């Protein structure tokens, strides 16, 4: 029954995308089937096949070790404040945000050394050959596995000005369907399962292309002519690369911290108002989370959450992520991952929630896309603005598809035990 419900969820998500497509007749069966096959095959390999699960675990251990090295720098700066066992306990601003700074610097060094470019070219080339997509959208999708929605398009910056509407939309969806490697480390610091975060990041690449090409198929002629490389902004050495990345990471961490202070406080204010008004009618426990849980509970059922209480919790997280952002969603989710949590979620539900939240698909991302892509190619700013809401919908569907597929194989694995 669980398998059938997951398959039904996948079919419904694809059907929604087809209904929202601007040209259903132009949908490429090769691209759609290929992208779905890659997503399902990769999920089966790392979430169901024992050897693949071991490889994913090894990758997660490696990333955890890298994070641990970053903690040395955090401990040096913050001392006892960075030790959760001390009286100060777990301090989000000390344990989570600085990891973003470290990872941002590390990724910049990997870019300087050319390692990231090689990996992106290999993965992007594989996607291009398998799906028949253009070089630009394939490379950007591959880059989104590791970096965020404003950094990934830099890989194909020379293409943006002249790319087709479908290509531009695919790049936007790739950004909304994925997260940045730097913030992934931050989510892991909150207790979100790192294995699922890594898996979701890789699955986001084919998922983003799948829903981008369903909702905005390629009808124009695209060009794969190699643009000229621009090394004018390349750091002079590794130290400058690390410093520049750390500086950018600090700005990101400050933005995340400021955003959380504002939004978490605003949510508390709204909950206070809702509980006060709800108390007049006998609903004193009414909150924004409970409203989201009610609205998105059917969606949680659709993507594979079978327990009623857990479906309500998953609905809360999905609503938070869409209305606010994924960081607030994960912050709420982290409460259910604590040892003293009153509600213990099943492993399948944990996976589904982690995958469903693992993307920048929220309404504030539209402004980020306009600023990022519009800055790289000012002539395309109006196109980005026009396609913004549709890109958020496509990115959300991509995240939900990954969550559904993950739930399917984790459920099969649990049933086989």
Swiss-Prot record:
Any Gene Ontology CC annotation: plasma membrane
The keyword Transmembrane is annotated on this UniProt entry: yes
Keywords from the UniProt entry: Cell inner membrane, Cell membrane, Membrane, Transmembrane, Transmembrane helix, Transport
Biological process, per Gene Ontology: nucleoside transmembrane transport
Main location class: membrane
Compartment(s) of residence: Cell inner membrane
TM regions (residue ranges): 1-21, 32-52, 96-116, 168-188, 192-212, 261-281, 286-306, 351-371, 392-412
InterPro entries (alphabetical): C_nuclsd_transpt, C_nuclsd_transpt_met_bac, CNT_C_dom, CNT_N_dom, Gate_dom
Membrane-protein topology: Multi-pass membrane protein
Gene Ontology MF term list: nucleoside transmembrane transporter activity; symporter activity
Family: Belongs to the concentrative nucleoside transporter (CNT) (TC 2.A.41) family.
PANTHER family in the record: SODIUM/NUCLEOSIDE COTRANSPORTER, SOLUTE CARRIER FAMILY 28 MEMBER 3
Protein name per its UniProtKB record: Uncharacterized transporter HI_0519
Classification of source organism: Bacteria, Pseudomonadati, Pseudomonadota, Gammaproteobacteria, Pasteurellales
């Amino acid at each position: 029954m669980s398998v059938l419900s997951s398959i039904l969820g996948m079919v419904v998500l694809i059907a929604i995308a087809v209904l929202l497509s601007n040209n259903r007749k132009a949908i490429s069966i090769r691209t759609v089937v290929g992208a779905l096959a890659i997503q399902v095959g990769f999920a089966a390999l790392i979430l169901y096949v024992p050897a693949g699960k071991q490889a994913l675990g090894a990758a997660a251990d490696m990333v955890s070790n890298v994070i641990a090295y970053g903690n040395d720098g955090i401990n040096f700066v913050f001392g006892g404040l960075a030790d959760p066992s001390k009286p100060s306990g777990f301090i989000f601003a000390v344990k989570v945000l600085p990891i973003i700074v470290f990872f941002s610097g590390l990724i910049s060094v990997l870019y300087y050394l050319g390692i990231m470019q090689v990996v992106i070219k290999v993965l992007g080339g594989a996607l291009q050959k398998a799906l028949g997509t253009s070089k630009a959208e394939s490379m950007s999708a591959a880059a989104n596995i590791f970096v965020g929605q404003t950094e990934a398009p830099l890989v194909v910056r020379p293409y943006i000005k002249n790319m087709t509407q479908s290509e531009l939309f695919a790049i936007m969806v790739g950004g909304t369907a994925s997260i940045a490697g730097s913030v992934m480390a931050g989510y892991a610091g909150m207790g979100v399962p790192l294995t699922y975060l890594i898996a979701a990041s890789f699955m986001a690449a084919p998922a983003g292309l799948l829903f981008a090409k369903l909702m905005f198929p390629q009808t124009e002629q695209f060009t794969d002519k190699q643009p000229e490389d621009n090394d004018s902004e390349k750091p002079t050495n590794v130290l400058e690369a690390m410093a520049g990345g750390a500086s950018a990471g600090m700005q990101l961490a400050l933005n995340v911290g400021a955003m959380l202070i504002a939004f978490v406080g605003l949510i508390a204010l709204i909950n206070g108002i809702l509980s006060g008004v709800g108390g007049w009618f006998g609903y004193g426990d009414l909150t924004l989370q409970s409203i989201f849980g009610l609205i998105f509970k059917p969606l949680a059922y659709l993507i594979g959450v079978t327990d009623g209480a857990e479906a309500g919790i998953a609905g809360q997280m999905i609503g938070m992520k869409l209305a606010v952002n994924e960081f607030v969603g994960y912050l709420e989710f982290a409460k259910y991952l604590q040892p003293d949590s009153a509600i213990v979620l099943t492993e399948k539900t944990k996976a589904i929630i982690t995958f469903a939240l693992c993307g920048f698909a929220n309404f504030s991302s539209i402004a980020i896309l306009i600023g990022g892509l519009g800055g790289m190619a000012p002539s395309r700013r109006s196109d980005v603005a026009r396609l913004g809401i549709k890109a958020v919908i496509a990115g959300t569907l991509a995240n939900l598809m990954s969550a559904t597929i993950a739930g399917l194989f984790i459920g099969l694995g649990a049933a086989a035990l």
